Structure formats: C-alpha cells, structure tokens
C-alpha cells in the first residue's frame, strides 16, 4: 500500500488536502509505529521538495498533539461560548442529535436544520459525503462558495458556460506571458509561486492593490486602486483594439457581443484608465500589449471577485482572452479553478456527493444571510458546522457571536480541534485528521489526483466525517443505501470518474497521477457551454437575471467622510483559519497589524508602530500600524482568519466586515469594507 519499510521505520506517501492551489505530495516518516516526521515528497510534480512553512510546522505540531486534538464526543456543560464541556459516548451524542433532529422536523420542518461547511478538508469523501445525509433529511445548506468565490463562478458561467475548466498548468511551457490578477500564490500556493511561475521564460504580470511577494517577483506590477479592476480591463482592451491586437478571426468564429461592447471599449483610453485606477497610462499600455501578443495565460484570483461588483469585474476580465484569442491553444487560456476530476473524466464529477434521491428540497442560503438568520429562532433551529470555523471566517462577527449564543439553537460542531465556533456548540464531535483515513484528493490547479493514505489510527475516539454521518444515519434508522456506501467503493468510483488509469493500489505506491499524460489544451474545439455555444460577452441569461447584458466599464467610488477601504487577504502562515491554533504559527505571525501607505499615514497624522483603532458601524479593532507603500494610498491591509481566542480583543478583522452581497452569486464583498482610523494616545 505505498509503504516503504526498513526495520522499525516506514515511509508512507500521502497527499495534503488543504484549500490550496498546490495539492502537495507528502511523505510520512514513522519510527517504531509512531509518526516521527511529516515532510514534502520531492518526487511530486508540485511539491518538489519541502512542504510550505505553515504545513511543515502545523503537521508536525498541533496535528500530532493529543493535547490539542479533540478526542471524544462532548456535551456543553456551561454557558455558550464558555468552552465548558463534559465527555459523553458516541452512542449518547448520536442519540441526542438524532432525537433533536426528529423533534425539529416534527415541530418546525427539517429545513430549519442548517448545515454549513467549506474546505477544512478538500478530500473527496470527507469533503462531500456528509451532504448525502443532509439532503436525505431535507436540511438547508448554507452555500459554501458564498463565503469565498461564488461571484466569479456565476460571472464566468455567463461568459463561458463553465467556471471550473481553466488551463492545464503544464501548457505554460508554451506561454510568452502569464497574467495573475487578484491572486497571491506566494501565500495561497507557495509551490506554484516557487516552481511553476518561474520554470519557463514567460513574462509575469501581476495586478493587485498590494505589492505581494508574487507581485514583487513579477516583471510588471500594476498596483490597481481597490474596486477599479473592471475599469482597468476596459483600458487594457482599448489599447489592444487601438493597436490592432484583437483576434478578428477568433471573434468572428467564437465570440458573441463584441460589436455591442466596442463603443464602451473605445471610450476607455489609457489616460481615462489612469484616472480611474491610479496606474500610469504607459504601464497599462505595456501590460496590454504584452498580454495580447501572447500566447498568454490569465489567472483570475478568488480575491478579485470579493467586491460589490465582483461579478462584473470577472465579466470584464474575461473579455481579454476572448478578444485576443488567448484560449484553446498551447500556452494560452484562462483559469479560475479547475475541477480536476471533471476535466479528467471529460465532464463527470466526484462521486463523494450524490445528488439527492428526491427532487426539490429547500434552496441553499448565502453565507451573507447567516448573521441575520441566526438572530431569528423561527428561521434556524439547528446549526451543524463541519469542515469550517464560521465564527472566525464569516463577516459581521459580533452578530454571528450573538446568534450562536442563542440558548434554544441546537448547534453541532464536527472538527479536529476546539475552534472558536466549537466553543458555542451543544455537541462537539471529534473528527479524524487526514493522516488517519484513506481518501482521494484532487488539486484545483494542477490536474493531479492524489492518494490520501491512512498513516495512523484515529486519535482517541475521533472518526472520519463520512463515518460520523453513516452512524448518524443508522441512529435515525434510515434505509437509503447511499448513506452507507463504504470508502473503498467511493474511492474506486472516483478514480474511474477522474480518467486516471491507476488503481488505488498503484496510486498509493506512486502517491499521485495526472489525469492526462500530456498537457491538455482546454476549449481547443471552440465550443462553449453557453446557449449560443460561443463566448457570450453579451449575455441574454444575465439580462434575464436582472443584470446588465454587457460588462460595465465601472470603478467603485472612493470612500468619503474620512473612511478608508479595508482589504483582508490570506495570510502567509494560515490556510483560511486552519493552523491558527498552532503555538509556533502564532509566534511566527506575531501580533496582528494594519498596513497603510505613507501618504495615508501622513494625512491621518499617524506613524509606524502606533496603536490605532479601526472602527465602523459593526465594531472596532485595535491593531499596531505598519506604514508601507506595499498598499495603495487610501486603502488598508489586514490579513484574515486569526483565531479569536488567540487575539487580545477576542476578535479578528471580520468584526469590521459587512455581510454585503456581490452583484451576482450572493457572495462576499469583504474587500469593500470601509473603516475610520484613529490613533490611541
């Protein structure tokens, strides 16, 4: 089973299931039956050496620490939020949950049971199987993508009919330009940044309001004013049109709506772009020409669409490959996320989640609605949290805390650790870690499938997510066979669906497999999953949904009344909120800070090292100021996802973030938060 043994030592190949572009291979070194070291697989095409710093620390820290892990089912014994619990048996825990669900169903309806989840683990079974249970009972799902990337998915679906079939990264060997817009792989895909981005000779352009490590290493950095991305896309398109760099033949054969949007493009000169975006006109021209000449890859980051008109931004940016023909040929393409299993299977999907056996059921709700819904006893009677930590990750943190404190709200949290959210639970169930059960992982960047191999027995009485919900289904005496499908069956079906030739045995021995031997050229046939079969710049579906027919050349208005725009991207040492409880990670992060530009600091009369208060209508946060030109003037930078219980004020940046929806997808517009700043004397 992919295990190398010598005397009392073993080396096991497995895969990192974190929410990361890398999809790294891991070697687990065991000595005398115990895990001695978790390290990177040097033979893996993404990892090529050590793990990233955060995984290297945490996987050899809290993930192996029995004092940090949840080991047994727990029942609340004190006030909500106090973290006081008593140990109970699995039978007691499951019986209580089952009875409460039955009571809620009879009295209020099963749609009053809400379950929320996201990417605490991205492995196929643990990340998807529990949905079978909730769909079976008719519970309401909190749409996971609305905390992250739903606006981008909605926008690209209007344009291309698909948002998860990007480029194969291996095609970069034929690229002349790689444009990364609103992504920072140095933090969110460290091995992509270290290896892939520089392994060929393509020029790298980064568009980001922050001079990230990725931006600092690029050939060109366009430091756009937050909220002005659509305007920048139109200004670049103006240059491309003016300089005769559009691909007229590709447009004729594959694009709908070019003539309609052309008048807007012709108005958006580079000088206009400078006024809207803060980027010099010459730099706009340089980037536009470099991209248009191609072959070029366009990477649209998830952070880019976390703004009020994030969907419109994506529709505007999507015109770049459409109008230059940088799609469907070697070295060219666009990327948001890759459904690697679907791409490998040429349109299939991962079997971990099966569509419910019945039609209908309650529609999902947006994460942006949850802070308010939690205040309403008539709306939510039970809140089940798995694979996420919403108290740390959701906006409107104070309202989230207030809702979770409701005594009559029956809250169940399933996790490896006692998170901030778990402190408010009535029942806490211990989840097994990725080192403790078999599963399948797929990278959402590299088109690779990885074996997640059990390296040790689950700690204490912890169980994999899927086994927890099999047992809960049994406690509720359900008969539906899909609720009990075993892991090996799902693994084998997943491998077949992905198109890889390897068996599970072979995959564990190698550790990983590409879904295709040679680089795939996606969209090479020029047929798109839109109603017209073409790239739809002009979208009748968008129009029918109450949205503009065309992308708009807009920029957000700058804040007024002394307010500043706050952006809160991913931190180097955290993966969302994962790893936020590791004491070495906490030490490496240091105290939370806020960064502003020197011009902004001068205008406000504040200086480097000052203690400052960030305030708005939702709350306040006291932080130490860093003054740096890494952020554009008029904006503030605070990294997201610190655990509240590790912070002096028991709050992170989400105490300031408004649960405001994007223009499409009902997603988060967290990067449009506005605050005032004052020095604490």
Whereabouts are the PLM-identified features?
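N-terminal leader/propeptide and maturation segments of large enzyme subunits in energy/redox metabolism
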Residues: 74-87, 92, 238, 242-281, ...
């Amino acid at each position: 089973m992919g295990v190398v043994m010598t005397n009392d030592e073993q080396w096991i190949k497995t895969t990192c299931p974190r929410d990361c572009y890398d999809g790294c291979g891991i070697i687990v070194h065991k000595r005398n039956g115990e895990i001695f070291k978790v390290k990177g697989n040097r033979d893996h095409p993404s990892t090529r050496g050590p793990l990233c710093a955060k995984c290297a620390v945490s996987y050899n820290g809290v993930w192996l620490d029995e004092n940090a892990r949840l080991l047994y089912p727990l029942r609340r014994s004190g006030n909500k939020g106090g973290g006081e619990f008593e140990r109970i048996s699995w039978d007691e825990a499951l019986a209580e949950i089952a009875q409460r669900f039955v009571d809620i169903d009879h009295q209020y309806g099963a749609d009053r049971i809400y379950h929320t989840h996201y990417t605490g683990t991205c492995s196929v079974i643990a990340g998807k199987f529990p949905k079978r249970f909730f769909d079976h009972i008719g519970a309401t799902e909190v749409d996971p993508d609305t905390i992250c990337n739903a606006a981008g998915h909605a926008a690209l679906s209007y344009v291309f009919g698909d948002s998860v079939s990007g480029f194969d990264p291996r095609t970069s060997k034929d690229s002349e330009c790689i444009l990364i817009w609103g992504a920072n792989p140095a933090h969110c895909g460290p091995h992509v940044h270290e290896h892939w981005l520089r392994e060929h000779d393509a020029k790298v352009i980064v568009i980001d309001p922050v001079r990230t490590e990725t931006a600092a290493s690029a050939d060109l950095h366009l430091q756009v004013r937050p909220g002005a991305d659509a305007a920048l896309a139109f200004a670049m398109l103006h240059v491309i049109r003016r300089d005769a760099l559009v691909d007229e033949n590709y447009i004729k054969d594959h694009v709908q709506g070019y003539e309609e949007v052309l008048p807007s493009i012709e108005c958006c000169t580079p000088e206009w772009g400078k006024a809207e975006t803060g980027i010099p006109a010459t730099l706009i021209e340089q980037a536009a020409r470099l991209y248009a000449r191609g072959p070029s890859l366009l990477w649209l980051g998830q952070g880019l669409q976390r703004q009020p008109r994030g969907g419109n931004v994506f529709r505007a940016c999507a015109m770049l490959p459409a109008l230059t023909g940088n799609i469907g040929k070697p070295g060219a393409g666009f990327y948001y996320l890759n459904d690697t299993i679907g791409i490998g299977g040429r349109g299939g999907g991962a079997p971990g989640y099966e569509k419910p056996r019945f039609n209908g059921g309650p529609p999902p709700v947006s994460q942006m609605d949850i802070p308010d819904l939690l205040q309403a006893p008539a709306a939510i009677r039970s809140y089940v949290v798995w694979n996420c930590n919403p108290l740390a990750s959701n906006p409107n943190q104070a309202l989230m805390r207030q809702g979770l404190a409701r005594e009559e709200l029956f809250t169940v949290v399933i996790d490896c650790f006692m998170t901030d959210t778990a402190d408010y639970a009535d029942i806490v169930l211990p989840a097994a870690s990725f080192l403790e059960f078999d599963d399948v992982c797929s990278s959402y960047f590299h088109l690779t499938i990885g074996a997640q191999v059990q390296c040790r027995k689950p700690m204490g009485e912890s169980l994999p997510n899927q086994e927890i919900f099999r047992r809960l289904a049994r406690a509720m005496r359900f008969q539906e066979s899909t609720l009990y499908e075993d892991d090996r069956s799902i693994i084998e079906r997943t491998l077949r669906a992905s198109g890889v030739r390897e068996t599970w045995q072979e995959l564990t021995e190698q550790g990983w497999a590409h879904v295709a031997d040679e680089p795939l050229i996606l969209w090479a046939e020029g047929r798109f999953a839109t109603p017209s079969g073409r790239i739809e710049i002009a979208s009748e579906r968008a129009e029918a949904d109450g949205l503009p027919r065309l992308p708009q050349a807009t920029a957000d208005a700058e804040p007024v009344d002394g307010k500043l725009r706050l952006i809160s991207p991913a931190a180097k040492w955290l993966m969302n909120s994962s790893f936020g409880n590791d004491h070495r990670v906490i030490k490496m992060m240091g105290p939370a800070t806020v960064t502003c530009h020197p011009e902004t600091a001068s205008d406000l009369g504040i200086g480097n090292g000052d203690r400052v208060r960030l305030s708005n209508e939702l709350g306040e946060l006291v932080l130490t100021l860093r003054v740096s030109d890494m952020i554009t003037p008029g904006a503030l930078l605070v990294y997201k996802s610190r655990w509240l219980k590790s912070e002096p004020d028991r709050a992170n940046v989400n105490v300031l973030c408004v649960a405001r929806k994007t223009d499409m997808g009902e997603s988060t517009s967290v990067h449009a938060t506005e605050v005032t700043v004052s020095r604490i004397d």
